[in-house]
Structure formats: structure tokens, C-alpha cells
Amino acid sequence: ILTEIIIMETVVQFIEFLFYLWLVFSITARNANVTSIRYFDWFITTPIMLITTILYFAYNSDNDRFKDKNDNINLSSVFKKDYKIIIKIVIFNFFMLMFGLLGELGYLDRNIALLLGTIFFLLSFQIIYKYYSNLDEDNKPLFYFIFIIWSLYGVAFLFNYKYRNVSYNILDIFSKNFYGLYIFYKILKKKIER
């Protein structure tokens, strides 16, 4: 499972790299709404990040319910046990992003978009907390970190275009890069301990 988590986090880093590479080369196109384009990155990366978090929490707990017949926890064993829960989290994440994008594009009032997006954000994180973060006390600090960082995207959504994008860039560094490094560190530490 650790290798699967690292591979998935590498995909997140690669997609983020491509987005920022595109951003640097298209910075001259000041007419482009960078924020709305950013959502395409998020539609791919955020479900992956949520799934890697769930996998890490399952692994960290060493809970028997996630183990396969060989007594291993892996992507397949977690999905077999909890695919309905994971699909629900991914769907809630999709709606969170969809309402944000609709607000960004002006198809929905920004305040309504924020409210609806926040509802789906809270629903997805409530499920993660209930079914995965709660499995082990060591999971909770990471859960709270992710919850706080992701909540700040909602705050940044309220800023004007310039400050919103600067905030999103900073938040992406913490939610993707530092998070990926943290997961890598925790996995390395676990491997050394076992």
C-alpha cells in the first residue's frame, strides 16, 4: 500500500507541475481566467489526494477490516471493503469543486457557490473523520491539518481575483507539496519502524 500511495502522490505532484508550467508560459495571456482553469487540476488531484489520505489512514491503523486474505492492506483491499464510502467522498468532492467553478465562472452567485461547496466539503470530511481518521489517534493531526488547509481555500474564494490566486498558489504548496513530503516522511518512518 505504501508504494501505491507514493505513486498516487507522485501523480498529484506531476499534474500540479504541469498546471504551474502552463501558468508560467501563459502568464502573458492576462485575459485568461487562471482560477477557473485551476479547477481542472483540482478535479483530478483532489480525489487522488483524498484517496491517498484514506489509504494512509487505513494503513496507519493496521485495522483488520482492511486486510486481504494474505493479511495485507492495499489499495484493492481498502476499495473492496469501502468502495461505497470512497465513491461517496469522491462525489461530494466533485460537487464541492463544481459549485466553486460555477461561482468562479459567474453561473452561480459566489456566496451561494461558497455555501453549497462548503456543505459538500464538510460532508466529505465528516465521512473521512468518521470512517478513517478515527481509526487511530495518530491519524487525527494529519486529518486536522488537511481540513484546515482545505478550509482556507473557501476563505480564499472570497478574495478578489489577484489575492485569490496568490492564496491558491500558497495553499497548493501546503496541500500538495508539503502534504506529499509529509506522507513520504511518515511512510519512510513507518517502514523503518517495522
Give the residues covered by each predicted segment:
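Polytopic alpha-helical membrane-helix bundles and their juxtamembrane interface segments
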Residues: 1-40, 45-194
